[in-house]
């Protein structure tokens, strides 16, 4: 197989990567994001061990998630699934009283054909608590698709758009009442005037989908607000009771590349209009994301180029370190295309982008942006390999000798033993990487192995590393 990097984007498909993180890990960040929720993972002891170890939260700390462990009686159909789940949900209601209970199906529930979707509506009527069913099992391509499944299920529970119009009337009434009172301070009057000027530039409702920490979500909302774009809501909202209203007049835009199932549900089932934009990862991606949203609403952007330039100036110390370095993405979390595009813009050379699954329709804008970035930087286009075979990848890495490999945890130590610097791709999932201000965190993660190597060289250990490298590969 030729390893020459072409001048256009080339797509290949191999036999697949079988060493991936489990999608039920989405519970780790979703239970923190949706504050009034409770996640019930229906699976085996293995799932319980994974949650307890991977999430780093002990069960006796009483987090807002739990395991419904399947036993031999469940698998052999000796126990009544409905009664068992009802008992657990009654206990959850009594102890925690959440606004929603989210059942997470696993591989085992798929294999034994447990009818979670059939039981949920009956139990919901009995308990009076919404029960959302999401099959976040290991049959998906990547562990981040667990969030995609949960958000797609929650999209069905969002209220209709009419409610949104009623809320707008209430907001307008509230603002007129506030203006009426003369005891408002000058600052508050100025703020109210600014808000009314933003609202005066009417545009259809905009809902953003993708789970981000509250601080990052508010940063992106405020960046759009600077451009006179008002965000109507987020999916998921911080509280289940605050889910955004959806309908055929609502525009939706994603913030993560792994939410293709959610995007499809929003378009087909809820009749929303999808804004296909690059994802807000890195200063370049954030600017392109905002520009695309503004162009759809016929709003001219202001001072956006200067804002991006200012961020690049602040990243100068990191850019000097990564410029000219090469990176190889083995593929793990579906963030690879966006991260590769950002690193190319930083001056790095990307040999290959391995990705477990690529939805070319949902990521069309990102792929085009990647191509344009490569052309503007004068860097050859990387090969994109869907479902990469790890054995073939290691052969290619041996020939290309990248400075850094971004890989899943299963391959990190073996690659380090062969003298290749690695970075766990799962760290990019849990880190705050979206928006203008968080670009520094991305480069902090990428440069950590490179800075470690520089420190080792200063200690005179570089010769030992090189000798080991030759021994292992030859």
UniProtKB/Swiss-Prot annotation:
GO molecular function ontology, one term from the record: ATP binding
GO annotation, biological process: light-independent chlorophyll biosynthetic process; photosynthesis, dark reaction
Domain of life from the UniProt record: Eukaryota
Subcellular location: Plastid, Chloroplast
Pathway: Porphyrin-containing compound metabolism; chlorophyll biosynthesis (light-independent)
GO CC annotations on file: chloroplast
Keywords in alphabetical order: 4Fe-4S, ATP-binding, Chlorophyll biosynthesis, Chloroplast, Iron, Iron-sulfur, Metal-binding, Nucleotide-binding, Oxidoreductase, Photosynthesis, Plastid
Annotated catalysed reactions: chlorophyllide a + oxidized 2[4Fe-4S]-[ferredoxin] + 2 ADP + 2 phosphate = protochlorophyllide a + reduced 2[4Fe-4S]-[ferredoxin] + 2 ATP + 2 H2O
EC number: 1.3.7.7
Cofactor: binding comment: Binds 1 [4Fe-4S] cluster per heterodimer. The cluster is bound at the heterodimer interface by residues from both subunits.
Cofactor dependency: [4Fe-4S] cluster
Main location: plastid
Residues the entry annotates as binding [4Fe-4S] cluster: 22, 47, 107
InterPro entries: LIPOR_BchN/ChlN (IPR050293), Nase/OxRdtase_comp1 (IPR000510), Protochl_reductN (IPR005970)
Alphabetized PANTHER family for the sequence: LIGHT-INDEPENDENT PROTOCHLOROPHYLLIDE REDUCTASE SUBUNIT N
Entry similarity comment: Belongs to the BchN/ChlN family.
NCBIfam families referenced in this protein's UniProt entry, alphabetically: DPOR_bchN, PRK02842.1
Purpose of the protein: Component of the dark-operative protochlorophyllide reductase (DPOR) that uses Mg-ATP and reduced ferredoxin to reduce ring D of protochlorophyllide (Pchlide) to form chlorophyllide a (Chlide). This reaction is light-independent. The NB-protein (ChlN-ChlB) is the catalytic component of the complex.
Quaternary structure (record): Protochlorophyllide reductase is composed of three subunits; ChlL, ChlN and ChlB. Forms a heterotetramer of two ChlB and two ChlN subunits.
Protein name per UniProt: Light-independent protochlorophyllide reductase subunit N
Organism: Physcomitrium patens (Spreading-leaved earth moss)
Classification of source organism: Eukaryota, Viridiplantae, Streptophyta, Embryophyta, Bryophyta
